[in-house]
Amino acid sequence: MSINMNANFLKLLTHFRRHDLTNFKSEHDTLYEKALETGDHLEVTSHYYSVMSTVIDEYFGGNFHFVPPKFEGQKLEEALKSLHCHIAEKLELSENVHCLDIGCGIGGVMLDIADFGAKLTGVTIAPNEAEIGNEKFANMGISDRCKIVAADCQKMPFEDSTFDVAYAIYSLKYIPNLDKVMKEIQRVLKPGGKFIVYDLIKTNDYDKDNKEHYKTLHHLEYACGMPSLHTQSEVEAAAEKWEMPVVERENLEETYGNRAFHYCFSASPMFMWLVSSPVIDHTIRMAEILRILPAGFKQFNRTFLCGTVNSIVGGGRMGILSGADILLFEKKKI
């Protein structure tokens, strides 16, 4: 599937004609406030993906994470597959290797690396994502080596030392307590097993007292139902505590000629206009009034669709958000 951001933005408008969004934001607000009080974001994350997982499958090719292109004009789906294969190569995937995908969503990464021949097991907190992914695997005839389990990655239903390697792509940002998830990853990995993290992280340039910095990242965290974003040093320290020291770091923006991780959005002036223009906002409001779009769509779009894109691009441009760092860890051998 070709991922055309401009065309897909317009398709999304049609897609949401099928949804009742009147209560979505109020439910999200309630669950997000509850998450801030309890420190448990599982409910609000699941609520977010109850709608967004289908969007990600249909309009983003099954992956909602980003990567700098290797060259100007490279299609997003090609850049993502290149990233996924790059990670698979770093983990030395092959037959007789059992690999864990932590926060796998609907299995988009697993599909891209299935040809490496490894046994792939994914974990997602959202049951509807497991259903979508497993149905796709069955239709493709790869269910014998690709499977998604609906479970909490902080309490996984696997025996100790089950997996040879593991990766987490844009998923640890949903975990408030990295200590718990790193302990669990260390438990299910075999001694000497490698583990890759590729995620959105807060950079050292973030200033909590800077109103624009705070507004940008807080909106992203709120819209996606996430806790406060982690820094690279926090990720590394949490893994180190559980005897999984970092053994390699790679920033793909530097590797690929300083192109931004948000290139898929920001490289298109037309797309950025679509997600920022008051004209589009007004048009959507009129479509709501005429019942062409469902009630609540204007606010949903401003908060969860366009708002998220603008936060990602804005955070990247301010240098307070990074989304192109590969961190390779290795569990110490006994």
From Swiss-Prot:
The cross-references to PROSITE patterns, in alphabetical order and at most eight, read:
SAM_MT_ERG6_SMT
CDD domains, from UniProt? Answer: AdoMet_MTases (cd02440)
What is the reported phenotype of gene knockout?
Mutants show impaired dauer larvae production.
**EC assignment:** 2.1.1.-
- Catalytic activities: 5alpha-cholest-7-en-3-one + S-adenosyl-L-methionine = 4alpha-methyl-5alpha-cholest-7-en-3-one + S-adenosyl-L-homocysteine + H(+)
A Pfam family annotated for this chain is: Methyltransf_11
- Kindly report, in one word, the top-level EC class recorded for this enzyme: transferase
Tell me, what is an example of a GO biological process annotation in this record?
regulation of dauer larval development
What pathway does the UniProt record associate with this protein?
Steroid hormone biosynthesis; dafachronic acid biosynthesis
Q: Which branch of life, at top level?
A: Eukaryota
What keywords were assigned to this record? Answer: Cholesterol metabolism, Lipid metabolism, Methyltransferase, S-adenosyl-L-methionine, Steroid metabolism, Sterol metabolism, Transferase
Database matches in InterPro entries: Erg6_SMT_methyltransf, MeTfrase_dom, Methyltransf_11, MeTrfase_SMT, SAM-dependent_MTases_sf
Tissue distribution of the protein: Expressed in the pharynx and hypodermal syncytium.
GO-annotated molecular function: S-adenosylmethionine-dependent methyltransferase activity; sterol 24-C-methyltransferase activity
GO cellular component terms given for this protein:
endoplasmic reticulum
Q: Does the keyword Methyltransferase apply?
A: yes
The Swiss-Prot or TrEMBL record describes its family as follows: Belongs to the class I-like SAM-binding methyltransferase superfamily. Erg6/SMT family.
Q: What does this protein do?
A: May irreversibly shunt sterols away from hormone dafachronic acid production. Dafachronic acids act as ligands and bind directly to the nuclear hormone receptor (NHR) daf-12 suppressing dauer formation and inducing reproductive growth. By reducing the biosynthesis of dafachronic acids, this methyltransferase can regulate dauer larva formation.
Q: Name the chain's protein.
A: Sterol 4-C-methyltransferase strm-1
Q: What is the lineage of its organism?
A: Eukaryota, Metazoa, Ecdysozoa, Nematoda, Chromadorea
This protein's gene is called strm-1
